[in-house]
Amino acid sequence: MKLHLRMSFILCCSLLIAVLGMGKNRIKVACVGNSVTFGYGLNNREQTCYPAVLQRLLGTNYDVRNFGHSGTTLLTEGHRPYIQQTEYKEALAFKPDWVVIHLGLNDTDPRNWPNYNQHFNRDYQLLINAFRKENPKAKIWICLMTPIFHTHPRFESGTRDWHAAIQQHIHDIAKANHVELIDLHTPLYSRPNLFADALHPNAEGAEIIAQTIRSALTGDYGGPKMSPLYADEMAMQRRDPIVFRGTANAGEQVKVTFLGKKETTKVKTNGQWEVSFPAMEAGGPYEVHIATKAKQRTIRHIYIGEVWLCSGQSNMEFPVSQSISAHEDLATAAKQPLLHLFNMYTRFPTNAEKWDETTLEAVNNLALMGGNIWETANENTIKNFSAVAYHFGKALADSLKVPVGIICNAVGGTTTESWIDRNTLEWQFPSILYDWYHGDFGQPWARQRALQNIALAPKTALQRHPYEPCYMFEAAMLPLKDYAIRGVAWYQGESNAHNIELHARLFRLLEKSWRHFFHRQKLPFLVVQLSSLNRPSWPEFRDSQRRLSAKLPETWLIVTSDLGDSLDVHYRNKQPVGERLALQALHHVYDYHLVSEGPTCIKARAVDNLVYLYFENAHGLQAKGGAVQGFEVAGDDGVYYAAKAEIEGESVIVSSDKVPNPRAVRYGWQPFTRANLINSASLPCSTFKKKIAQ
C-alpha cells in the first residue's frame, strides 16, 4: 500500500513539473491594438475576439493575451494615445516573445492625423523599441489596418484619404524597423458584410484576422496550393513571361522544372512564391514539375498561345446548346484541338425567386462561381459554354493557328458597377456604393430582382448580391489576379441602359480598373453593342456605346443591331457575334489586313434639302435585302422625320420632304431597328446621330 502511494505521489509530481515546465516554455504572444483587437461589439467577446481565436488556433504551447483598448491612437499626441493606457503597461510587463501591433484606425480621426501625422513614424518606432527594450529577443509584427468602409460617417471627409496615407506609412515603418508586415486589409476588403458599422468586424471577421495572423506568425499557410488556372490543358499567353505562382509554407523551397530548365525559389513570409521563365512563342503541349518538401505536382498539356477573357452578362453567358447553330457546333466541337476553355459559371442564377439560407451565405462568402477547370473543346464541354465566347475563340484559333485559351466569367443580369473594383469606386464614384438596393443609380429591374433574391436574409443591408457594386469583381475577377491575358471581349449593358450618362461614366472606370488589375495599360477591349429590342432607351444607348468606343483607347465596337429579336433580349443567333469579335481582334490586335467593321459615318453635309453622308469602311456599300432603311433627318426644331436614302458609291444621300433645311441626321434609331446598311464584308453600320455641317 505504501509503495502504491509513493508511486502515485511521484507520478503526480512528475505531471506537475511537466505542466509547470510547459507553462514556462510557452511562447508569449501580445496582441496590441485598439477596438478591433479588443473585440468591440462582439457577442461573447472574450471568446470571439481575434486574440481568443488566435489562442485556440495556436494551441497550448502559446500564451496569447489581448492588450487591445478601444479608441486608442498610435500617435502619442492623439486624442487617446495607446501608450497612456493600462493595457500598454500590462503588455510591456508581460515581456512577450511575440508582439502583434494593429494600430492606426483611430489616427484617421480629424483631431489626430491632420495635426500630428508628421510624428506617426516616430511614435510607431518608439512603440516598437519599447517592446524590444523589455525583451531584446522579441519578434514584432505590425499590421496593415483592417478596412474602413464607405458607410463610415467621415469616409469622404477625410477618413478614406487618411486611412490610405497611414497604410503607406505602415509599409515604410515595417521596412525601416526590420519588422514583419501582416496584411489585415486584403483578406477583409472584399467582405463589407462583416462590418456592420463600417469599422468593426463581426465574429467571422475576427476569425479571418486570427487566421491571417496565425499564418504570419507560424509560417503555416496550409502547404502548397495553386490557383485552379494552373491545371492540365491550361493555356498561357505567348510573348509574356511564363509565370508559375502559388502559396506554400513560409521558408519552404519550391523547385520548378519547365522545358528542362530548373528554377528554385524560397517562399516569402506571406506565403507567396513565384517563378518566371522567359517569354515564348506559341507551342505545346508542355509540362511543368513543381516540388516542395511536402508535395510534388506535375501539370501536363500546357499550351502557349493567346488567352482572352470573355465577360459581361446574359448574352455573353448564353450557352452554345441554346443557340441557333447548336447542332452543328456540338457535332464539330471535337475538331477544335487548339481551343482551351475555362468556364466560370454562376452556381446561383438570379432567377425570380427568394434564395435560401445556404445560397445567401455562399453569396456572402463570394462562393458564386463554379467550374474553374481547363477543358478542351468537345460536345460535352461546349454545350454549357458561352456561344459568343466559343465562336470568338474558334475563329481566332482558325486564323492564328495557335492555341487559344478562352476564360468566360459572364453572369446574367450583372451591372457594370458590379464588375468594378472597390478601390476605384471608393475614390472615383463613392456615392454609388451607398444603399445600392434602394438608391436610384441601379437599374430598377436589377435592384428589384436583387431584393427579391435576398428577401430572406436576416439583415438585407449587409447581404451581398451579384448585381451590387464591386461584387462581380470580388467574386469573379479576383480569382484571375496576375494571370496574363491578351485582351477582353465584353458584352454587357442591358442592366445599365436605363441611364446612358451613368453607364458612360462607369464604363470608363471599368476599363481603367481592369487595365490596372491585369497590369496592361493598353489592354484591348472588344465591346459588343446592344442588339435590337423593343426597349425605348436602346437606340441612344447603342449610340453612346459607339461614341465611347471611338473615343476610348484600345477599344473597338462590335455591332449587333441586325441580329436582335424584337421580343427577346436573348436572341439565339450568337455565331456572328463571336466571329465579328474575332474580326476586330485580328485587325486591331494582330494586325491582319482585313475589314473588321461596318460602314462608319465620318461626315454629313447639306446641299439644299439633301444630306450627303460620307463613310469609311464603305467598300461595296449596300442595303441588305432591298431599299435602304433606317435614316431620319431633323431641322432646326429637332423633330426627326423618316427620310429617303440612296447609295452613291461610298456615300448615302438622304432627304425628307418634311425637312427643307436639315440640321441633323440619325440612323437605326428605332429600339428594334430594321436599318440595313452594310459593306462588302456584310458588316452592319452602327446606330448613329450626326449634326450636319453647313
Regions found by a protein language model. Give the residues of each.
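Bacterial Sec-dependent N-terminal signal peptides
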Residues: 1-25
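Alpha-helical cap/lid subdomain in secreted, periplasmic
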Residues: 2, 24, 56, 79-221, ...
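Conserved SGNH/GDSL esterase-like catalytic core that processes O-acyl groups on lipids
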Residues: 25-31, 36-125, 300-301, 307-309, ...
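Non-catalytic, glycine-rich low-complexity segments
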Residues: 222-250, 300-310, 317, 584-604
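Extended acidic/polar, glycine-enriched regions
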Residues: 245-326, 391
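Catalytic-domain carbohydrate-binding cleft regions of carbohydrate-active enzymes
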Residues: 269, 317, 328-330, 334-335, ...
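N-terminal structural subdomain of ketosynthase/condensing enzymes
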Residues: 324-372
